[in-house]
Amino acid sequence: MLDISIQELIKQWQKYLILQRNYSNNTVIAYNNDLKHFLEFMNYYNSELVTINHIKTVDIRLIRSWLAKRKYENFTASSIARGLSTVKNFYKFLEKTILLNSHIIFSIKSPKKAKLLPKALSVDDVLISLEHIEGYGNVKWVELRNKALLVLIYAAGLRISEALSITKLHLQNLEFIKIIGKGSKERIIPWLPFARNLITKYLGILPYKLDENEPIFRGKHGKKLQPSVFNRELIKLKRVYGLPEYLTAHSFRHSFASHLLEYGADLRSIQELLGHKSLSTTQKYTQTSIKHLEAVYNTAYPIKK
């Protein structure tokens, strides 16, 4: 049970989240449930009515016991982290309203969330996406831009940041594209004619003149296209055509690797094409020639024609 003054503080906190922080009702409900769970545990832990004094004097042992209980109850690492974040949010609010001094709770680190690999799309979902991303909207060059960018990410396995950095200089070589990836590591990827021709077609109707060293993918007003803008286009695509919720720009890069593997490419060649961190370690033991990469690519890739 809670002291009446705490109940009033919780109501004020909820209003603050909605009116001052612009949180959605669903988010506030989730936060309220997390805080309720914490305060109920505090009530159980202290075996008495929770008061303002309990809130002020809560110690690390209680908080860690609460986190351990959530883990025992099979809460996910993400849910446990959100719960702790909620309680910290509430205490931050108390600092402003009842002048609570900086509290020990802020020194507790959130549990590490498990890093999950993005799911690969099926070949059918990829083909549906490539077919329809150009099929809606009312600005032709923007539609073609979206398709060219999506094809490039999937056909070359690029990160969205890498694809958005492509310039006309990258198009000068008809056979290969040279990418400078994370950690300034260079990798060379065979050009698929299908992807290159689509980009050339897009540049033919792009209403902005670009220097050779300027990124070719532009926003509606001529500035460099931002990842968030393109991801919004993919969200529209998902909604209109009922595509998987996990469809993102990065899922096409992941699908590039998964589909190559399914069609017979070896892991080491895929590592080189993706430019993963482990590439430098792999190169110490095997020197894969560009010609071999091209052969693997042309033999294994499902949209090569």
Curated annotation (Swiss-Prot):
GO terms for molecular function: DNA binding; tyrosine-based site-specific recombinase activity. SUPFAM superfamilies: DNA breaking-rejoining enzymes. It is found in: Cytoplasm. GO terms for biological process: cell division; chromosome segregation; DNA transposition. Signal peptide: none annotated. Residues 4-95 form the Core-binding (CB) domain. Residues 116-298 form the Tyr recombinase domain. This is Tyrosine recombinase XerC. It comes from Rickettsia typhi (strain ATCC VR-144 / Wilmington). The gene is xerC.
